[in-house]
Amino acid sequence: QQHKVLRVMGKKLTRKALEMLRKLSQKAAKDAEDAAEAAGDDEEAAATEGDDKDAEEKKDPYIEFWEAFGKNIKLGLIEDSSNRTKLSKLLRFKTSADGGDKWSSLEQYVGRMKEWQKSIYYISGKDMEEVKSSAFLERLMAKGLEVIFLTDPIDEYAIQNLTEFDGKKLQSVTKEGLKFGDEEDVDTKRAELYKEQMKPLTKWMKGVYGENVEKISVSVRLASTPCIFVTSQYGYSANMERIMQSQAFADNKRTQYLVSKKTMEINPRHPIVVELLKRSEEAPDSEETKD
């Protein structure tokens, strides 16, 4: 197996297979575009398009391949660094664009991005219900930003080996340092104002939680939720921690070492947080306030 000729043959076979899959995926995408244009010209077709959506997707030969062998493509993304760019174009994910019902490529995602959007956003979880209802999506949905849903245990491992696509950085919405790309001077000033306004509360809360949290900060990602816990930019996400801890031969000591402390983000506009700020200033030692 280590013979030079066999290694060369293996590389050529891999390239041929990837080229075949690329053509299959591109043909499927073109057929979908042609079908959409035809439906737009035909009122009757447009009226039945929604009913036939699932059937059309099942007929897509590349989607059939993806649903059967998608995990192998993701494994290739992890193990084959020389073909990572080619493999990334074969990936398919469900996203918030259509409620998580349809597969999309990263190229299609980039094509739908806002003009000012600089990152490809994703969220991971154990199932579709969990990621769809996540509080991490609140501000992104309000801004009309599309988020990729990662629900396969291997997804996050694969994405960690793909730091960017088409010049766009892949960013987890559950980690700190989240930015949207449309921030203006007024937004920056408002964020600084909230940070200064909430400083007494963040300092008091850090004293209450102590070593249980890394820090307390003011959130830019929350809209209707009072607070949330996020992981550090280079730490494991909560979903990745769950996967590691559930593995049969997991090293608990090593897992605990790699699990980072969480940062607690508070929503400065939420009534509960505003009231807590007031109480922390008026009665910081009160057991009722701490509870």
Task: Name each model feature, range by range.
Residues 1-291:
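Conserved GHKL (Bergerat-fold) ATPase module
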